[in-house]
C-alpha cells in the first residue's frame, strides 16, 4: 500500500515522498483497518525502511541547494554528516508520529487499535536498507523506553503498539564438529 499507493476515504494516496509521510500514511491505514474489523493489525518496520532512502536523497538535495545558495563548499564527509543528522531527526519525527497516532486513535467501535510492530533486520533486501531499518528500530526502541506522558505529565509505557523484535543468534559449529561432517 505504501509502495503502490492506496485509497483512503475516497482519496488517492500516492507513494510517499518522505519517511515521515510514510509513517503518517501507515497510521492512517491502521486507523481505517482497525475501524472496519475486530482484532489486531501487525505492521513491519521493514515496509517503512525504503522511505529512509527517499528522505536521504531529498535531504541531500536540500543540503546541496543550501550550500550553493550560501556559496559555501563542504567536504563530502561533512555533507554526509549533515544529511545523516537531519535524516535521524526525520526518523525521530516519523516514529513519534506512529507512537502518538496509535496511542491516541479511537476506532469507530470505541477501542484503541490493537497494533503490533514487527522489527526484524533480516527482512531488509539490501545492506543499506538493513542499516536504515536498524536506525528505525533503534529509534522505536528508544522512544518506547522513554514512553509517553499521561494527562498528569507522568511518563508511562503505552500499551500499544506492541513491539516484537526478532533477534537470531548464530552459533558457529566448533572446529571438532567441522571435522566430523
List PLM regions with ranges.
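Active-site beta-loop-alpha junctions enriched in small/polar residues
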Residues: 120-122
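A short acidic (Asp/Glu
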Residues: 125-134
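Catalytic alpha/beta core of large soluble enzyme barrels
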Residues: 1-62, 66, 110
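Structured alpha-helical segments in the cores of large, soluble enzyme domains
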Residues: 36, 61-62, 68, 90-111, ...
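Conserved, mostly hydrophobic/aromatic
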Residues: 117
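Conserved small/polar residues in nucleotide/adenosyl-binding loops
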Residues: 170-175
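Intrinsically disordered, low-complexity acidic Ser/Thr-rich regulatory segments
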Residues: 74-92
Amino acid at each position: 500500500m505504501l509502495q503502490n499507493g492506496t485509497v483512503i476515504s475516497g482519496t488517492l494516496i500516492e507513494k510517499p515522498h518522505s519517511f515521515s509521510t510514510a509513517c503518517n500514511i501507515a497510521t492512517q491505514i491502521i486507523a481505517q483497518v482497525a475501524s472496519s474489523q475486530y482484532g489486531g493489525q501487525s505492521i513491519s518496520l521493514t515496509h517503512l525502511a525504503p522511505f529512509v532512502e527517499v528522505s536521504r536523497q531529498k535531504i541531500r538535495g536540500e543540503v546541496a541547494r543550501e550550500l550553493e545558495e550560501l556559496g559555501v563548499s563542504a567536504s563530502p564527509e561533512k555533507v554526509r554528516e549533515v544529511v545523516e543528522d537531519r535524516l535521524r531527526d526525520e526518523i525521530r519525527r516519523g516514529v513519534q508520529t506512529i507512537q502518538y497516532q496509535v496511542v491516541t486513535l479511537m476506532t469507530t467501535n470505541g477501542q484503541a487499535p490493537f497494533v503490533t510492530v514487527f522489527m526484524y533486520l533480516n527482512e531488509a533486501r539490501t545492506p543499506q536498507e538493513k542499516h536504515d531499518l536498524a536506525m528505525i528500530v533503534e529509534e522505536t526502541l528508544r522512544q518506547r523506553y522513554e514512553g509517553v506522558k499521561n494527562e498528569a505529565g507522568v511518563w508511562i509505557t503505552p500499551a500499544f503498539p506492541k513491539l516484537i523484535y526478532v533477534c537470531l543468534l548464530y552459533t558457529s559449529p566448533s572446529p571438532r564438529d567441522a571435522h566430523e561432517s
